[in-house]
Amino acid sequence: MTHIPKTPADTETLLSEVQGWKHRHVLDLDNFSREELDMVMQTAGVMLDILSRPVKKVPALKGKTIATLFYEPSTRTRSSFELAAKSLSADVLNLNVSQSSISKGESLLDTLDTLESLGADMVVMRHPLSGAPYLAANNCHANIINAGDGWHAHPSQALLDIFTILRHKSSLEGLKITLIGDIKHSRVAHSNIWGLSKMGAKITLCAPYTLLPEGLNTNSKIFPEVTLETDIKQAVSGADVVMGLRLQRERQQSGLLPGIREYARYFQLNEEILKLAKPNSLVMHPGPVNEDIELSQSVVHGEQSVINEQVKNGVAVRMALFYLCSGSKEI
């Protein structure tokens, strides 16, 4: 069972435990141990306590500079990382890609060299190409935090999803967690499969055949607790958590879907389908939600929805990642 600290008294214990953190970068969750995932959850619990105070700021990263480098549009993730950095008293260097030398053809590595020359200790980056953060991590001294790369990974989103579930459930062991949507092209799904599996959850992936990942089935040695399903009723039945994923409209243009409305007819999570899940089940979505396509409006704003809570918890989890990767010994 993962213990999430909820009182200031737990902070001293936390500080003595996090010294074993070994990751300089956060690129995905495939190389995280269960113990390291627990450490992130525990640290995020302390950060959430900080965010509940009248003064939502501590000097843990005072004097550090964190740069944000987003090659793709982002509102929630970028704002969340910036607020997390400022809550730890770090200076934030926000690079506007469209108005920088990048728009003139500057390479990723040259841009990173520039950021390091400007004093960046950490770089939060989002890139359309899968693997770009790994290239960055192998070629610069700053800590790299992956805020999403292509179809590959979005580790901080998966971590905040796990943290949000643990705020409502004592453990993820044995929970049925159902993900519905474009699994094949979702970096959120990919990181969640790693993280949720390591936390002991049983995962059901639900989508049309064309949007399910190839080569991932119940015979997988890596993910033995993952089930693929094309029937949403079967997928949601008995679920403890149901997570919708954004349907990327460009998939329809590539011929993988006959139409958005056709998708909604068979795979939308609405009130009728949600009744098949456990009565105390949670409804989640990484956002932005295409209402009445992935989730019905009533489900998005219903009592079981923790979507807004995910946004709030994201700041605490990203504070935890900054804190752990920095090697700071103070809060």
From Swiss-Prot:
Source superkingdom: Bacteria
Protein residues bound to L-aspartate: 104, 187, 246
SUPFAM superfamilies in the record: Aspartate/ornithine carbamoyltransferase
Record field: catalytic activity: carbamoyl phosphate + L-aspartate = N-carbamoyl-L-aspartate + phosphate + H(+)
UniProt: carbamoyl phosphate binding residues: 76-77, 126, 154, 157, 287-288
Entry keyword Transferase: yes
Entry EC no(s): 2.1.3.2
CC annotations in GO: cytosol
Key words of the record: Pyrimidine biosynthesis, Transferase
Keyword Transferase: yes
GO terms for MF: amino acid binding; aspartate carbamoyltransferase activity
Pathway info: Pyrimidine metabolism; UMP biosynthesis via de novo pathway; (S)-dihydroorotate from bicarbonate: step 2/3
Gene Ontology terms describing biological process: 'de novo' pyrimidine nucleobase biosynthetic process; 'de novo' UMP biosynthetic process; amino acid metabolic process
Disulfide bonds, paired cysteine numbers: none
NCBIfam families: asp_carb_tr, PRK00856.1
Family membership: Belongs to the aspartate/ornithine carbamoyltransferase superfamily. ATCase family.
Subunit structure: Heterododecamer (2C3:3R2) of six catalytic PyrB chains organized as two trimers (C3), and six regulatory PyrI chains organized as three dimers (R2).
Functional note: Catalyzes the condensation of carbamoyl phosphate and aspartate to form carbamoyl aspartate and inorganic phosphate, the committed step in the de novo pyrimidine nucleotide biosynthesis pathway.
Protein's name according to its UniProt entry: Aspartate carbamoyltransferase catalytic subunit
Protein source organism: Dehalococcoides mccartyi (strain CBDB1)
Gene behind this protein: pyrB
